[in-house]
Amino acid sequence: MSTMQNCPHFGVCGGCSFPQSNYSDSLKKKEELLHQLFAPLVPSDMIAPIIPCSPSLRGRNKMEFSFFQTYEGEKSLGFISSTKPKKGIPVTTCLLIHEQTMDILKLTREWWDKHPELMAYFPPKNKGSLCTLTVRTGSPQQNFMVILTTSGTPEYRVNEACIDEWKEILLSSSLNIASIYWEEKVAARGISTYYETKLLYGAPSIQQKLSLPSDGNSASFSLRPRSFFQPQITQAAKIIETAKEFINPEGSETLLDLYCGAGTIGIMLSPYVKNVIGVEIIPDAVASAQENIKANNKEDCVEVYLEDAKAFCKRNENCKAPDVIIIDPPRCGMQSKVLKYILRIGSPKIVYISCNPKTQFQECADLISGGYRIKKMQPIDQFPYSTHLENIILLEREIDL
């Protein structure tokens, strides 16, 4: 079994919570934590064995690196230190991601070294220029989307000539770069943080191809900088396969896909149901979803609304309940009004997909109080060597309150 002990950042990088373990041992620890968490709600034998991540190394399709700078001026571009939470680790390699991602990081760091006037962004005081470097990997092409996020505060704004220099450094390399974006983070008191995005080079989207192992059903997905997509392509297929098994569709179902992102789950499940309605609040993700619906010829059975989930639920609270609700919310979980809507309309089946079992546990407890029962649970690992995992739960309505 693989371990992380041959990583040069072993013991100091905060990216891996179980770096000293072999992979099978880290899975056992995750299972133990999940069983302890859900013990008040379900018997232990209802939780299926965790599905391992394959491959456990080099499988991540997205990674975000942060810029750090000490008061003394020491710079680093990488991850947060596991021993000093406010300090960064200057990453030179990472066994979880594509090797060439590190070449992009190295070139960016060299560009930064040429510009001592550019300070790392410090969120608590909204000071500094350089925020993050994000790299997405396309599949099966193995090409890259690179996103540099900088401060949009006028005092710390990076000039366009400097950004153009960074772009040309990347393009002069032999790396297979599909897209380069410059993103400015606008944060100020009294307004919600937002991002102004500019495509500097290439196509607006990067592609991911997804296939289900059971029947070969496949689709291609266009992803923009802020489109959500599962971080491991092989595990994404297993998540959707599990959702399909839990639903056990007959072909006549209406499926409501809340927090649908780029439409991945709904599009992949559309061949097995009558129609899919997706809801997503991030414009970038909805733009990707619309592209994906058209590219995969799903206009007749999949539609996506650019709307806050709670607003959608309020607008449709008197409509007929969908046969199945898919919930795949952010780590903070559902909004309370969404939960109330789900309880009010009483759909027969809910498939709750979560990257944060703690919020999932609490919201499942609320759903149980409202007449639902947990029928199946399947954890899936897609964050090797960390404490994180994806957990999929099937709930069915048994009581009309």
From Swiss-Prot:
Binding site for [4Fe-4S] cluster: C7, C13, C16, C94
Residues bound to S-adenosyl-L-methionine: Q230, Y259, E280, D328
EC top class, as a word: transferase
GO molecular function terms noted in the UniProt entry: 4 iron, 4 sulfur cluster binding; metal ion binding; rRNA (uridine-C5-)-methyltransferase activity
Active site positions: C355
Keyword Iron set for record: yes
Signal peptide location: none
Documented EC number(s): 2.1.1.-
Any one biological process term the GO annotation gives: rRNA base methylation
PANTHER family cross-referenced by the UniProt entry: RNA M5U METHYLTRANSFERASE (PTHR11061), TRNA (URACIL(54)-C(5))-METHYLTRANSFERASE (PTHR11061:SF30)
Similarity comment: family membership: Belongs to the class I-like SAM-binding methyltransferase superfamily. RNA M5U methyltransferase family.
Protein name (Swiss-Prot/TrEMBL): Uncharacterized RNA methyltransferase CPn_0885/CP_0981/CPj0885/CpB0914
Organism: Chlamydia pneumoniae (Chlamydophila pneumoniae)
